[in-house]
Amino acid sequence: MAHKIAIGLVCVLYALHIMSAVCEVSEQEGVGEDNATEDEDYEDFFKPVTCYFANSTVGPLRPPNCTVVCTNNTAWWNDTKSDGGHCYSEYRPEKRTHSREIYNCTIGVCGNGTCIANHTYADCW
């Protein structure tokens, strides 16, 4: 008989524990968005990042100022490559409106925040 009472008591305590946990969760759901959880605070860091390069036969090229605009759907920032990255030194705005048109562009290497032309050419689009 004592064994049955002990099992009954454990079941009642377990049920009370489950009920208190469920009540705490439902109370937290009613809280305003000002009290955001840690999961929501870090959610934006894991979104895909998109950076805007010019396409070419030698790979992605940075603009003449060697700064690429990047976004992850919540924030924008400039990604600057000071030295060593490929860039295009010639900007032709009339060609940028037709993104699928291939044209000959002058390429160079980023140095000190500017594109230094090395007198080589590539097909750009």
Curated annotation (Swiss-Prot):
Signal peptide interval: 1-21
Glycosylated residue positions: 35, 55, 65, 72, 78, 104, 112, 118
GO MF annotation terms: C-C chemokine binding; chemokine binding
Listed name of the protein: Evasin P672
Domain of life of the source: Eukaryota
Organism taxonomic ancestry: Eukaryota, Metazoa, Ecdysozoa, Arthropoda, Chelicerata
Organism: Rhipicephalus pulchellus
Keywords associated with the record: Disulfide bond, Glycoprotein, Secreted, Signal
Disulfide cysteine pairs (residue numbers): 70-110, 87-115, 105-124
Cell compartment(s), UniProt: Secreted
Function: Salivary chemokine-binding protein which has chemokine-neutralizing activity and binds to host chemokines CCL1, CCL2, CCL3, CCL3L1, CCL7, CCL8, CCL11, CCL12, CCL13, CCL14, CCL15, CCL16, CCL18 and CCL23. Binds to CCL8 with 1:1 stoichiometry and disrupts CCL8 homodimer formation.
Classification via InterPro entries: EVA_Class_A (IPR045797)
